[in-house]
Amino acid sequence: MEQLKVEVDPKQGGDLPSIYTLQFEELEMWLKEQGEPKFRATQIFEWLYEKRVKQFQEMTNLSKDLRAKLEKHFNLTTLKTVTKQQSSDGTIKFLFELHDGYSIETVVMRHNYGNSVCVTTQVGCRLGCTFCASTLGGLKRNLEAGEIVAQVVEAQRAMDEQGERVGSIVVMGIGEPFDNYQALMPFLKTVNHDKGLNIGARHITVSTSGVVPKIYQFADEGLQINFAISLHAPNTELRSKLMPVNRAWPLPKLMDAIRYYIDKTGRRVTFEYGLFGGENDQVEHAEELADLIKDIKCHVNLIPVNYVPERDYVRTPRDQIFAFERTLKERGVNVTIRREQGHDIDAACGQLRAKERKEETR
């Protein structure tokens, strides 16, 4: 095993690092440095991820001395809930405040097969997708791994109140996950760890807008995690208009990276395709999309987009959505239409955060 060096700066207050940032092996090493036995790591992880305590003093099978050390070195209240909204369909949306005053969003979605949580990886986003509220205001900073993990913990606490559990995770919230790769990978390892949140790899999905170098790196990780690509256009010209990231890594380079991922992992990918009225939702676009992906092991997820007041795009009519789906199916494409959720609580990425920011500046 690669040796881990744990460097923890014992500051006070909000500057303390989140305990959720530590992977299991890192916690074991920190405990060793403190003169504590390694088995304490299992006990601490149980308190964090099974019992989901909010204070170190609740970890009653630890010595008072160890609890004091934990309080001195780590922060356990990583997120502060600003608002919690529940949609008529059961979707729950959180607006969390971070220690430095920035805010992020997390969404819990109810499905027939269980509950999933959509987590955020950045405060804002630099990629500037023209249809997305997440990019309003640009990128402020990356989240730490612990700030991403804490979103899942808070979501599970909300489910605890209703006697339910979070069964899957989608990394599709605010930000580009591959722009925060250094926090993404520790997050994935902790939520998948059998002593952590213990969510199976095939119940975790990571989505990217198309940061091509990181797709190759992610493929080489050898994970069994689900992989999705925000595609949204069937040709490079239209994609560059909708998604400026395509100017850095044009569609042909993206498709090459996706083929590498499939060859390396043996897993299929999901293409997320948002339908924007009059932009990318015509039958000819569906035909072009079918040609683009005809040799790729994939699934297409059509997304009737939520209206974003700050953007100009309009919703595609229902009959046009079904025509698009039918065209793909006729050409042998595995396709579904995503069920709308949270439409009445601003559940599109970044909308709640944007609304909060707007109210603060009035």
UniProtKB/Swiss-Prot annotation:
Binding site for [4Fe-4S] cluster: C125, C129, C132
Required cofactor(s): [4Fe-4S] cluster
Domain Radical SAM core residues, every copy: 111-344
GO biological process, one term: tRNA methylation
A Pfam family: RlmN_N
EC number(s) per entry: 2.1.1.192
Keywords: 4Fe-4S, Cytoplasm, Disulfide bond, Iron, Iron-sulfur, Metal-binding, Methyltransferase, rRNA processing, S-adenosyl-L-methionine, Transferase, tRNA processing
Entry's localization field: Cytoplasm
Domain of life: Bacteria
Miscellaneous information on this protein: Reaction proceeds by a ping-pong mechanism involving intermediate methylation of a conserved cysteine residue.
Annotated family: Belongs to the radical SAM superfamily. RlmN family.
Protein name: Probable dual-specificity RNA methyltransferase RlmN
